[in-house]
Amino acid sequence: MSELPVPELPVWMGDVDPSRIGFPLPVDKSRYAKEVGLVYKETGRGPLHLDAYRPRDAEHAPLVVMIHGGSWHQGGRYEMGLTRWAGYLASAGLAVVSVDYRLAPETRYPDSFQDVVDAVDWCVEEAAALGADPERIGLWGDSAGGHLALLLATSQTRDDFPGPRLRAGAERLRAVVAWYPPTDLVRLHELASRGEGGSGMVRGFIGADPEAAPGRWREASPLEQAHAGAPPALILQGTRDLLVPHTHTARYAERLAELGAPHEFHLVEGGVHGFERVGPGDEARALIERARSFLRERLGAAG
């Protein structure tokens, strides 16, 4: 049998050994059923899809909505290790949906965020078919997906948020897990402009410079929307992240602490962007397990 090719890694992963890429924990596929390509929304650019993972031994299971990363410009529900992640959660008794959303630069904020909001509303309406409890919803996202997950969790539980809103009500949002998430978009844009890290794709997502649309930049930043009543958050970040500097994410955690908002913040020494898929070793595995247990605890999963 020939060996699998070693993938080429993007420059922002630094000097990680490519042979270490992969999801480090086992997934028991016998414990869940998967349905792919469900249409949750029609748009002018075609339908938007999600994949559903339903635990075989659980009815009315807590639901986790997974939002992929890719700097808001690329990626999809079937990429970036999400299928393994979804299976890992579903095998622990959590119903999971992994969603697509329209990408920049063709789609700008708030339309891509509206897609994520609409996906949650669709899941509430279709909860019975998903084997899910619509009153217990958790959010999960990595990178840009972590940003959208945090924005959804913080904004929808405010009365004064001017952007897209859930029809179903925000009280059902019980927890959010965000891996290396952009949280202060203006700051991230400034860092990228000076060549000090950060993603230069933020402007493409917003569609204007901060000076031209300051309200839109503030509206789209979880740091600006954070408040004490937001759902509990688990935030995970590496110190060698070249896209989302760890000081950026630490500032968000500090803001949550100042507000008295429930949260956990884990900073992984030497962790790169995507560290849970490339190490470092035992700590990454422990944090993956913690992410699953956090969702189970906060959503009240049985067993």
Give a label for each model feature:
Residues 1-303:
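Alpha/beta-hydrolase superfamily serine-hydrolase fold, recognizing
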